[in-house]
């Protein structure tokens, strides 16, 4: 992808990057391991973002 991006696309990519985090360890410990992953995890190569 080009280094020069429109601001809107850059903001969308940044938001997607921040949302794509794992479940925190304290949440896994608090639920005794029943919650290990969240359903909105996105892999960079498999799933695409909206343009």
Curated annotation (Swiss-Prot):
What's one Pfam family the UniProt record gives for this protein?
Answer: Ribosomal_L39
Please list the GO terms describing molecular function.
structural constituent of ribosome
Q: Which InterPro entries match?
A: Ribosomal_eL39 (IPR000077), Ribosomal_eL39_CS (IPR020083), Ribosomal_eL39_dom_sf (IPR023626)
Write the record's keywords in alphabetical order, separated by commas.
Ribonucleoprotein, Ribosomal protein
One GO term of the biological process aspect: translation
Please give the residue ranges the record annotates as the region Disordered. 32-51
List the record's Gene Ontology CC terms alphabetically: ribonucleoprotein complex; ribosome
Keyword Ribonucleoprotein (UniProt)? yes
- Stretches with biased composition (Basic residues): 33-51
| Coiled coil regions in record | none
- Domain of life of the organism in this record? Archaea
What family does this chain come from, according to its entry?
Answer: Belongs to the eukaryotic ribosomal protein eL39 family.
NCBIfam families named in the record: PRK01242.1
The identity of this protein, by name, is: Large ribosomal subunit protein eL39
What lineage is on file?
A: Archaea, Methanobacteriati, Methanobacteriota, Methanomada group, Methanococci
């Amino acid at each position: 992808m080009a280094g020069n991006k429109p601001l809107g696309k850059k903001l969308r990519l940044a938001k997607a990057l921040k949302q794509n985090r794992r479940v925190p360890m304290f949440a896994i410990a608090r639920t005794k391991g029943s919650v290990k992953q969240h359903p909105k995890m996105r892999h960079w190569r498999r799933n695409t973002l909206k343009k």
